[in-house]
């Protein structure tokens, strides 16, 4: 199945912040949406997930158009979202953070119990499962948030700067987690093949190497002295 959007436009008053953006991701694929602050990345995510409506353009899940569906209906159909900002429920335990979304989705008790144990184990949350969200480190919080997003078995998940507020050691752990999601046949918008947004429009798309080799990308975003280094995420994805 494919999640894709065509020619998305978003305006705020006279200012157009997203200008005809088209993106697609297949299940089991990791796609990056790159760009400097203010390029329109988060706004594009908001439109795809249903947080805001586009002024123009269309969004599809498989053959079904979902442009006008509210966010909760898109979530029910398999579109998950992890916000850039911390979204853990601060006064709830890690266990209850994960259980709460399954309860709202209507899963039965037996499924919730089994799925909780699977996620706690997969994300290395055993030692903090009873801890409140406010007590977690940046890496623990992010792992909890990703586990919660996966609790309802999404087909696709949009990760908006998932490494924000996370220490370097935890970043590597989360890179491995994201790479593992690909093997679970979940489509992810973050990096493998990438789109680079600049001033609301797609400047370039392709592999990381193709973006790094593009003179306009170097001039407007990466800088002339940029050197592409293979990250752990890419190594794990390609294994």
What residue spans do the PLM features occupy?
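The feature captures the beta-strand-to-loop junction immediately N-terminal to the Walker
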Residues: 34-36
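Helix-to-loop junction immediately C-terminal to a conserved catalytic motif
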Residues: 49
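Conserved ABC ATPase "signature" region
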Residues: 110-128, 176-179
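Conserved ABC ATPase signature
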Residues: 132-136, 140
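Conserved catalytic motifs of ABC-family nucleotide-binding domains
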Residues: 153
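Catalytic Walker B motif of ABC-type/P-loop ATPase nucleotide-binding domains
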Residues: 157-161
